[in-house]
Amino acid sequence: VLIDTYSTFNFYFAYLCSQLCRILKLKYVPILHGGNLPNRLKKNPKLSKDIFNKAHKNIGPSLYIMASFKGFGYDNVVYIPNTIELKNYPFQKRTFDNIHLLWVRSFSKIYNTNLAIEILSLLNEKNTDATLCMVGPENDGSLQKAKKYAKELNVEVNFTGKLSKQAWVTRSQDYNIFINTTNFDNMPVSIIEAMALGLPVVSTHVGGMPFLIENGEEGILVAPNQADLFVKAIKQLQANPDETYRMIANARKKVEMFDWEIVKKQWFGILSG
């Protein structure tokens, strides 16, 4: 039984599923999605041990999560990265005459949505032609707060709401920089997808991001909640296209290893064990 496991309320759902599997004598495999799961290990050590120590295997989709769990004494963690079907993400070479920012995530407090709007405002203040598209569903009221914040800062943001995978991939053709503003993260599929599409990524330096993106080689990582550092990184990408193209090529090469045709062999090994 595969159990998607997150750090929020879903953690308790995962706990109940794991205990039911134990009663029914079924092997279960938690898939460790939440970038804030290490804090959950600290806050709920007993429940965590009941879930993870008894698991057939725990799947860490990032080296960050695997290292964090091993730091708490969990040795039955296997690294299998989040996957994409690479054929669905056509690589596109972009130009950077103007800045067109793309943000893709659910509108949740932990993803610090307002920072993206602040970045756009700061770019406008510096007389840099820039646009921002924010793709994702409402989760905890953050979408409405973001719309209100955009009005307060007098900036125009394209809020699309939730889009299908194909729809946002198609829309991404009109944008040239991907920003990730989160305060907590693991190994987000949206970042992998952006790297596959040829979008240079500027992200906060949190959670699993340094394990996914080597700073200055495959994208740019900055401190969280610092709009000025994002703007500096964005303008750096614009001013140095050759260096930007080098990072884009490195990023694409890395995520080619996350293609399902490659990763599925690891899954088959776990599920047949």
Where are these regions (language model features)?
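Aromatic "clamp/platform" in nucleotide-sugar-dependent glycosyltransferases that forms part
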Residues: N183
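Nucleotide-activated donor-binding/catalytic signature segment of Leloir-type glycosyltransferases, i.e.
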Residues: K145-L163
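C-terminal alpha-helical cap of glycosyltransferases
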Residues: W260-G273
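Glycosyltransferase donor-sugar binding loop
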Residues: V104, T131-K145, G161-K162
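Conserved acidic donor-binding segment of nucleotide-sugar-dependent glycosyltransferases
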Residues: N215-G216, I220-A227, Q236-P241, E256
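Conserved donor-binding/catalytic core segment of Leloir-type glycosyltransferases
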Residues: K93-N124, L132-V135
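Short hydrophobic beta-strand element within catalytic cores of glycosyltransferases
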Residues: P200-S203
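Donor nucleotide-sugar binding/catalytic pocket of nucleotide-sugar-dependent glycosyltransferases
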Residues: I51-P90
